[in-house]
Amino acid sequence: MNSLLRLSHLAGPAHYRALHSSSSIWSKVAISKFEPKSYLPYEKLSQTVKIVKDRLKRPLTLSEKILYGHLDQPKTQDIERGVSYLRLRPDRVAMQDATAQMAMLQFISSGLPKTAVPSTIHCDHLIEAQKGGAQDLARAKDLNKEVFNFLATAGSKYGVGFWKPGSGIIHQIILENYAFPGLLLIGTDSHTPNGGGLGGLCIGVGGADAVDVMADIPWELKCPKVIGIKLTGKLNGWTSAKDVILKVADILTVKGGTGAIVEYFGPGVDSISATGMGTICNMGAEIGATTSVFPYNESMYKYLEATGRKEIAEEARKYKDLLTADDGANYDQIIEINLDTLTPHVNGPFTPDLASSIDKLGENAKKNGWPLDVKVSLIGSCTNSSYEDMTRAASIAKQALDKGLKAKTIFTITPGSEQVRATIERDGLSKIFADFGGMVLANACGPCIGQWDRQDVKKGEKNTIVTSYNRNFTGRNDANPATHGFVTSPDITTAMAISGRLDFNPLTDELTAADGSKFKLQAPTGLDLPPKGYDPGEDTFQAPSGSGQVDVSPSSDRLQLLSPFDKWDGKDLEDMKILIKVTGKCTTDHISAAGPWLKYRGHLDNISNNLFLTAINADNGEMNKVKNQVTGEYGAVPATARKYKADGVRWVAIGDENYGEGSSREHAALEPRHLGGRAIIVKSFARIHETNLKKQGMLPLTFANPADYDKIDPSDNVSIVGLSSFAPGKPLTAIFKKTNGSKVEVTLNHTFNEQQIEWFKAGSALNRMKEVFAKSK
């Protein structure tokens, strides 16, 4: 018998949504050269927005126009910001290779023959930075051959475009090839909002949400509030687009954007390039925002034209009123930032909202004992790897070279795409970086997501790195909890590489040239777009054929077909144990680490061995050490969870504020469910993670009174009661039984709607999908 499992279809819906192909409804301008039969939806959007405006009788923000323009039932949909659940029809789905594995495994499990909307897979997360671009790429292709083959064949069979390893980072590829003003895109990566730089609503989701959209099921989103950020003045000197979002993070903090779309407007918008706007939208993920967006303007027109999409730019220009906010549109909150007076910022360490203006950084560093010597400077990532970013950084490196200086730190450059890499090589920027002492890494995420084989410091050694990345959680980049990571612009990162010091202020401080003379760096200069046009480089796209075989070996340690989670048995969840009570920040990195664990993203059982590895146990202040409340023995968190599961003991986890902050990885929800968890009880959730938990049949619950967190002991037995009358808006009750026999009753809130309650009852959203499809046959 063949040792490979051949995947067959289980069921299928009665019909599929047309891919924007009706000329009577859709404009006949293709959305991408890679999808010539899918067309811009502006006429349909206009019609739907008119229906909604006639109902609401008020001006709309840009966010509302795009979102409501994609409503499944615009005539009847309840629309109330922060209250209603919207049922939406996104234009497309994008998946990166680490999350696409589980998304495609779930889609295959659904039994459907083809995706219902244009979709793509992008290979960017599984390439480790070690020796440099070409060598690292070759090594990654060899190590991940099985996974890349699975994604390529699954994409080909089910109608999903496949961007090969080396093509670039998902968000840069989307910006270059697929994003357009008015787009509604969902992507299985938290930095999907990058596409807002071209005027689209691009939203990070878990893989199960992507499966819904690919299966032609309306996508649900709680109607977001809208935070308006008015930009006045102009960017100038050392101040860059990155500083706008670093300042916003300072104002709103890591959870200030939760449940809201951040919409930029005002005269200052016109001084920012399209890729700069992408940078700002990208890091909106760090404030918990649903997404971020800019109005259509000439910067977007120029970028679309430069990337071979002039037809789209012209069509968008015709619909500019649709692609900008109405006069008098109402925002739930307005923040004003004057770009004339904005200064460069450096945020960190350990959190992206701890902001220091460049003139205060040295003082703050000395006061807090942050290491002043910078060990590594890293530019690039999905946040800052555009041609403009590279030209500005190169202009600073060139000044140093002209004075006989090179980088004092290790210096790495991550191009965002093959197109950016080929273009900066052609235009001589790569040579400047090489002469400066820099190493150009592969077109991939690399150190930004922890794919970095760092050798210059030992684990536990206190040190500082400066990056143009987006996140700097503890251990995020190099798995060293003692590394102090600071996030800033590529300009400031490069300047600090020259000085080697965190307290260096390039606006005021002097450097010593090779000949002993003193000099100051001049403000960076850059080009929004390459004067000679973009060089596309190597062709790295595989179009789907609609046929082929997808194989998953049962002996694989990288890929594993999914088994359905068990249904709810109709009873209250009684006498559960507390696996861990987490104290402090608990991001998706703490729940399901990335880095070396990325290789197991397609194998649920194996990756579950990283559950809560770096979360701090409130009981003992330690990581990965919890007490088995049945045996009394201490052990690793995953091993303890497995023991509970083997013994038929269900468990919960207790958490603090903004639980699940960070990435969209649904493994942070799948793993607790796989290892026997039934509920996560916290003070508050990050949006994407809360939805991911619901999708997997878990109960994400919040304390009605956050102070009740302090009443809970890790040794308590937990019962969640009232599930027989589980209903939207109706709190549940938890009873915590102490070791002395006393009980504490706690009210728990939830955000489940009726459909999500059906997910819980079925055991998962995927189980519920199969039930619905089976009934429709």
UniProtKB/Swiss-Prot annotation:
Substrate binds at Q96, D189, S190, H191, R471, R476, R601, S664, R665. Binds 1 [4Fe-4S] cluster per subunit. Gene3D superfamilies: Aconitase, Domain 2, Aconitase, domain 3, Aconitase, domain 4. It is found in: Mitochondrion. Disulfide bonds: none annotated. Residues 1-26 form a transit peptide. It is an enzyme of class 4 (lyase). Its cofactor is [4Fe-4S] cluster. Disruption phenotype: RNAi-mediated knockdown causes accumulation of citrate, leading to induction of the citrate-induced mitochondrial unfolded protein response (mtUPR). GO terms for cellular component: cytosol; mitochondrion. It comes from the Eukaryota. Residues 534-555 are annotated as: Disordered. This is Probable aconitate hydratase, mitochondrial. It comes from Caenorhabditis elegans. The gene is aco-2.
